[in-house]
């Protein structure tokens, strides 16, 4: 995913935290903030030290999240800035569980623009 698709600055992160709405499941929390006049969505990913004590574990989970979001890119609403925050429960997730849990929370947060992903899971 290109840098233009990322929420990069601390200021942008804080704006989404403070003004956005949150939705969560056991593995992830998603904060969303609608942004009009935006060509494409922007996402920020946060995996703290409570999730994985080593950088290897945290980076692995971030890779899984980015891969899932890249796969879902056509279905993600373009008018959003959103943050994906991993919870400690997600520590031992493999790619399949990461994808399943992330799709679930993105649906709850209404980040996905259609329901085509439902058929993919089954």
Swiss-Prot record:
GO terms for molecular function: 3'-tRNA processing endoribonuclease activity; ribonuclease P activity; tRNA binding. Belongs to the RnpA family. PANTHER family: RIBONUCLEASE P PROTEIN COMPONENT. It holds the Pfam family Ribonuclease_P. This is Ribonuclease P protein component. Gene3D superfamilies: 3.30.230.10. One of its GO terms (cellular component) is ribonuclease P complex. InterPro entries: Ribosomal_Su5_D2-typ_SF, Ribsml_uS5_D2-typ_fold_subgr, RNase_P. RNaseP catalyzes the removal of the 5'-leader sequence from pre-tRNA to produce the mature 5'-terminus. It can also cleave other RNA substrates such as 4.5S RNA. The protein component plays an auxiliary but essential role in vivo by binding to the 5'-leader sequence and broadening the substrate specificity of the ribozyme. SUPFAM superfamilies: Ribosomal protein S5 domain 2-like. HAMAP family: RNase_P. Consists of a catalytic RNA component (M1 or rnpB) and a protein subunit. The gene is rnpA. Transmembrane segments: none annotated. It comes from Lactobacillus gasseri (strain ATCC 33323 / DSM 20243 / BCRC 14619 / CIP 102991 / JCM 1131 / KCTC 3163 / NCIMB 11718 / NCTC 13722 / AM63). One of its GO terms (biological process) is tRNA 5'-leader removal. NCBIfam families: rnpA.
